[in-house]
């Protein structure tokens, strides 16, 4: 017999500390927690093997191909400071292992099987370096930040949004009315909640028609371009496309998709349609916490964000730093920059394990949403800068006088912060003062400040 069968020691073939990574390799950083007694090199090598060419035993067909050319390699292991049994394993994958333009295939290869590995207690994909050669096979976001600003004719400030609540139970006519009030009051966008698809109490077509009416009425009265994220997410790709096509026929500017529950394949199809037909695409990340919340197992959100930029979306929800959902400031800013910028330097303090060059892939606007209100406005404009969408759901609709005054309060607070910044004031330290001054000439803002002055989500 020409080779020895039986379970093999992955370390022999797949741990290659001397390997020099190529510009075309896809690089991954895994946080691996091996079972007691399993050395980290063996665990890292096992991850490299099973997510590329390896199987658990030597097979006859290994002789029919060139493993040296196609195998994943674990080229570095570093201990995690302050944690006993955990290491960061760096793995390089040859580009030929992946289908062009398919986020789906990339994930199936890299995270498809290895997360159930017996030798590991837990495994987390912390970051991916997507090589330029692979980036170039993706269309990416349908339009990107600059084109969106040009379409909306809104410059030099963050955009304002609002999720219509109660998320489930309104009839289409009342839903459209809520949309109109918010847009009329001064918001740029309103949003379907992620779980509003087409339920018995409000079918999608009725909602689309009433929302389109609300958009056009508000546009005519304010002289500003308005939008409502019409959620096209559906049970089948065909139905999703049908909804997107109907939105285009109504002439509205933007549709929305839940990219994790809807799936990357559906999302990429929708993104291509949106670019071909001039629709902006708002992406919601429902289900992300299932994947990214555990510190030692799963996939970090920065990887899901990179994947979305490749698959395509013009906005994506990315945490708030200040509201009700968790997210540490530096880490959040790390993936916010990954979404917006062309080139991001490796910076471990922000959780960025690799330098990422996006070449000319358009950027994505980060959306801050979840438990934020007018008092957060200075912090949000300071943290996220101009290229962002700030979304106040309850922070608009919870206004004691109703939706339109709630929208007015948010718009006034935003404009006050932008003006203060232009005047050179420090938003971080003078934030509360800036908002207080603005309340003097805006009764709507004064009422909002009164309602939310005590609320904090602290756990």
Swiss-Prot record:
Please write the reaction equations for the catalytic activity of this protein. 2 (2R)-3-phosphoglycerate + 2 H(+) = D-ribulose 1,5-bisphosphate + CO2 + H2O; D-ribulose 1,5-bisphosphate + O2 = 2-phosphoglycolate + (2R)-3-phosphoglycerate + 2 H(+)
Task: Quote the record's binding site residues for Mg(2+).
Answer: 191, 193-194
Which cofactor is essential here? Mg(2+)
Give residue numbers for the site Transition state stabilizer.
Answer: 324
Localisation: Plastid, Chloroplast
Cofactor note (record): Binds 1 Mg(2+) ion per subunit.
Alphabetically ordered keywords of this record: Calvin cycle, Carbon dioxide fixation, Chloroplast, Disulfide bond, Lyase, Magnesium, Metal-binding, Methylation, Monooxygenase, Oxidoreductase, Photorespiration, Photosynthesis, Plastid
Query: Does the record bear Nucleotidyltransferase in its keywords?
Result: no
Q: What is this protein called?
A: Ribulose bisphosphate carboxylase large chain
As recorded in Swiss-Prot or TrEMBL, the protein's gene is named: rbcL
């Amino acid at each position: 017999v020409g080779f020895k069968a039986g379970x093999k020691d992955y370390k022999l073939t797949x741990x290659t500390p001397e390997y020099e990574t190529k510009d075309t390799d896809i690089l991954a950083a895994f946080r691996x927690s091996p079972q007691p007694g399993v050395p980290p090199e063996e665990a890292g090598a096992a991850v490299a093997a099973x997510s590329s060419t390896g199987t658990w035993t030597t097979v006859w067909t290994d002789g029919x191909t060139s493993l040296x050319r196609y195998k994943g390699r674990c080229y570095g292991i570093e201990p995690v400071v302050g944690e006993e049994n955990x290491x960061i394993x760096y793995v390089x994958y040859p580009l030929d292992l992946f289908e062009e333009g398919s986020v789906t295939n990339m994930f199936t290869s890299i995270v498809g099987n290895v997360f159930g590995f017996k030798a590991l207690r837990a495994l987390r994909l912390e970051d991916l370096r997507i090589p330029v050669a692979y980036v170039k096979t993706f269309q990416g976001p349908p339009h990107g930040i600059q084109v969106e600003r040009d379409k909306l004719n809104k410059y030099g400030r963050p955009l304002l949004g609002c999720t219509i609540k109660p998320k489930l139970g309104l009839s289409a006519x009342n839903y459209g009315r809520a949309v109109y009030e918010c847009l009329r009051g001064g918001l740029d966008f309103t949003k379907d909640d992620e779980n509003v698809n087409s339920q018995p109490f409000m079918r999608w077509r009725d909602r689309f028609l009433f929302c389109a009416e609300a958009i056009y009425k508000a546009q005519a009265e304010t002289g500003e371009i308005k939008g409502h994220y019409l959620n096209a997410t559906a049970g089948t790709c065909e139905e999703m496309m049908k909804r997107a096509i109907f939105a285009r026929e109504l002439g509205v500017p933007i549709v929305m998709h839940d990219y994790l529950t809807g799936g990357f394949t559906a999302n990429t199809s929708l993104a291509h349609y949106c670019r071909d037909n001039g629709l902006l695409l708002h992406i919601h990340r429902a289900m992300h916490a299932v994947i990214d919340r555990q510190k030692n197992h799963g996939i970090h959100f920065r990887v899901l964000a990179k994947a979305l930029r490749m698959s395509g979306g013009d906005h994506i929800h990315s945490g708030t730093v200040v509201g009700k959902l968790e997210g540490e400031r530096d880490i959040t800013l790390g993936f916010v920059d990954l979404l917006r910028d062309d080139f991001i330097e490796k910076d471990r303090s922000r959780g960025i394990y690799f330098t990422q060059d996006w070449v000319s892939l358009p950027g994505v606007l980060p959306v801050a949403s979840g438990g934020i209100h007018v008092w957060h406005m200075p912090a949000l404009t300071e943290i996220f800068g101009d290229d962002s969408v700030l979304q106040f759901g309850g922070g608009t609709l919870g206004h004691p006088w109703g939706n339109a005054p709630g929208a007015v309060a948010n718009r006034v607070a935003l404009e006050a912060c932008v003006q203060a910044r232009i005047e050179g004031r420090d938003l971080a330290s003078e934030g509360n003062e800036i908002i207080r001054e603005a309340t003097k000439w805006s009764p709507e803002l004064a009422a909002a400040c009164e309602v939310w002055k005590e609320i904090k989500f602290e756990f």
